[in-house]
Amino acid sequence: MSDTFLEIAYERARQAQQRQMKRRRAAAHRAARGPAPARAPRASPTQRTGTAHEDQALRLLAGAGLVPLARNLHCRAGEIDLVMRDGATLVLVEVRARANPRYGGAAASVGRAKRARLLRCAALLLPDLARRHWGGRIPPVRFDVVAFEAGRADWLPAAFTL
């Protein structure tokens, strides 16, 4: 082996060691600073509007005596906006808003397909909700809709059933 070949090999090994040492120092520095603060994902204007309507619906229902249990429960079938308790009844709430009533309004937007998705989602989430809040017994279930149109909230209790 020639001296040039050995010099090149030595130089590459030295550079690799320096890179590794630099990585270790950076990792130690990051560890000393602690974990990065968790950032909430930025919401689109539509998502912010939806969250505001859900907040209003939650205040409306809590003011009527319902007890909030969960919010925005996701499952593979979809999402349930609000989960409330009304005495011994589990109340699953869909919040809908429409700025323009031209196409039937907010309440009418909970059509057959949306109701079917909510029913599938409820069937998937019900065992866990019953275990957590009703000691494992399946409670009576009611589906309510809170519809926002023209700045007004309409609460439709028992909009449809299981």
UniProtKB/Swiss-Prot annotation:
Basic residues: compositionally biased ranges: 20-32
Stored InterPro entries: Restrct_endonuc-II-like (IPR011335), tRNA_endonuc-like_dom_sf (IPR011856), UPF0102_YraN-like (IPR003509)
Pfam families: UPF0102
Disordered: region residues: 15-52
GO MF: nucleic acid binding
Comp. bias intervals (Low complexity): 33-48
HAMAP family hit by this protein: UPF0102
Family under the similarity heading: Belongs to the UPF0102 family.
Protein name per its UniProtKB record: UPF0102 protein Bpet0439
Organism: Bordetella petrii (strain ATCC BAA-461 / DSM 12804 / CCUG 43448)
